[in-house]
Amino acid sequence: LDLARDVQIAYADLVFARAQKQIAAENARLRQEVAAIAAARLRSGDISELEESASRLEALRAQEAAVGFVQGAEISRARFNTLLGIDVQDTSFALTPASEMELPQRTLPELFNAAFASRPDLRAAELAIEAAGKRIGWERAKILAFNGVLDVNGAGKEGFEIGPGAQIEIPLFNWNNGKVARAQAQMEQAARQYLVVKHRLALEVQETYTDYFAAQQALTLCRSEWVPTATTAASQAQKAYAAGDVSYLFVLEINRQLLDARVREAEATANLRRATARLQHSIGFYQAEREN
C-alpha cells in the first residue's frame, strides 16, 4: 500500500520536474531575447548601463535556473526508477503523462467505512483483539461482538471503557489472580491499540480528503481562469505587435507571464496527483475499486 502511494507521488514529481525543465528553457530563451534588446537599446543610447546590466543578470539567472531544473528532472527520474526496482540510469522506457484521475464521488462517512474495511493496519489491530480473546477462552462470536461494540468514550470513572453496547464480562473460570490480571491487561491493551489505530485512520482520511478537494479546486481555477487569460493576453499582444501598436519587448513580457501560468498549472496538476495518491492510500484501495 505504501509503495503504491510512493510510486504515484514519484510519478507526479517526475512529470512536474519535466514540465519545469521545459518551461525554464523557454524562459531562459525569452530572457536572452530581452537582454539582446536591452543591449541594442544601450548602444543606441535609449537606456543606461545599469538597466542593461539588470536585463543581462536576469538572463543569466534564467540560464542557471534552467540548468538546475535539468538536474532536478534527472534526480526525479532516478527516484522513480528506484521505486520501480530498475536501474536509476535506465531511460529505455518512455513515460506518457496520463490525465488526472477523478475519484468516484463519495461522502466522508463512506470513505471512513472504506478505510476501516480495507486498511491492513486496522485489520492487524482486530487480529490482536481476536488473539487476546482466544487467550481468555472467548468463542469467536463473543470476540466479534466485542469488536462490534468497542468504541471510545474518553476517560470514565473506571478508566478504560468500551462503547455503548452490551456489557461483556470476561469469563475467568478457576484462573489464579495472576492470570486474571494478565488476561485483563492484554485485552485492554489490544482494545486501546485498536481505537488508537482507528482514530489515526479517521484523521488521515479527513486530512487527505480535504487536501484532495483543495487541490482539485486549485487546478480547476488555474485551467479555467489563469491559463486562458494568459493565453488570450499573449495572442492579443502578438496581434498588436504585428499591427505596430506595441514593442517586441512588450510581447516578450506577456509571453513570460504565460510561462508563469503554465508553471502554476503544472504545479497544481502535480499537487492533485499527489493528493489523489495520498487519499487512495488512506482509504486502502486502488485500481480494483476504481474499476468497480
Question: Which residues does each predicted region cover?
Answer:
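A small-residue-enriched
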Residues: 5, 77-86, 109-193, 203, ...
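Acidic, low-complexity, intrinsically disordered peripheral segments
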Residues: 264-292
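Metallo-beta-lactamase
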Residues: 69, 120-121, 268
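C-terminal hydrophobic structural anchor segments
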Residues: 213-242
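Alpha-helical heptad-repeat coiled-coil segments that mediate oligomerization/polymerization in large
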Residues: 48, 201, 208, 244-248
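Bacterial Sec-pathway N-terminal export signals of envelope proteins
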Residues: 46, 91-130, 170, 184, ...
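Periplasmic alpha-helical coiled-coil/stalk elements that build and connect Gram-negative outer-membrane
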Residues: 2-114, 208-211, 215, 219, ...
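A short glycine-centered flexible hinge/capping loop motif at secondary-structure junctions
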Residues: 42-46, 241-245, 282
